[in-house]
A protein has these predicted regions:
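Short polar catalytic/cofactor-binding loops
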Residues: 31-37
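Sec/Tat signal peptide C-region and signal peptidase I cleavage site
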Residues: 16-22
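Extracytoplasmic electrostatic interaction patches
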Residues: 145-149
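Sec-dependent N-terminal signal peptides
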Residues: 4-16
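Gram-negative (and chloroplast) outer-membrane scaffold detector with strong preference
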Residues: 39-119, 123-138, 142-144
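Outer-membrane beta-barrel "beta-signal"
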Residues: 125, 150-162
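Transmembrane beta-strand segments of Gram-negative outer membrane beta-barrel proteins
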Residues: 22-31
Length: 162
């Protein structure tokens, strides 16, 4: 058991020392995920090319099912939502390839056409993804964001790092 803990500690230490060679900032178009159907996100590291970072964005979603981020009584008609997803994340990996682990919250306004009364809502999610990001230029991510509403949010992003 001690050997397993020692090996795990060494592996985490090595990953941490070789992590986050990605550029400090990027702007991404996110399809699906915590942005709803589509959104724009800004991602940055807290300090230089540090492994800890954050992401914030603005998204739009459309739904005619039970996948709204807040419960809507009646379930008549379709729902439109405008959301602001915010996230803290950590990058593992080196060079241009990274494993992203994060957690965040999505805050927003939802209007169900059958109810027509805007509702404020939130949802909390995790983020598990692969990120390809050059120091300057093309950035790409693919992953999923499991959340409290038991909805599986796969997503893909395309963007530009600078």
């Amino acid at each position: 058991m001690k050997r397993i803990l020692l090996l795990f500690s060494i592996a985490v230490s090595l990953l941490s020392t070789h992590s986050a060679k990605a550029q400090t900032r990027s702007v991404n178009l996110e399809l699906l995920g915590s942005s709803g159907m589509a959104g724009v996100n800004y991602d940055a590291r807290f300090k230089g090319n540090y492994v800890f970072g954050y992401s914030a964005g603005l998204g739009y979603g459309y739904s005619n099912s039970n996948f709204d981020f807040v419960e809507t009584p009646g379930r008549d008609g379709v729902s439109h939502q405008v959301v602001v997803p915010v996230e803290l994340n950590y990058l593992f990996g080196k060079n241009n390839n990274h494993l992203v682990l994060g957690a965040g919250a999505m805050l927003g306004v939802l209007v169900n056409e059958g109810v027509m009364k805007p509702r404020l809502g939130y949802n909390v999610f995790a983020d598990i993804a692969y990120r390809y990001q050059k120091p300057s230029g093309f950035a790409f991510s693919i992953g999923f964001k499991p959340n409290l509403r038991e909805v599986f949010w796969p997503y893909i992003t395309f963007g530009y790092s600078f």
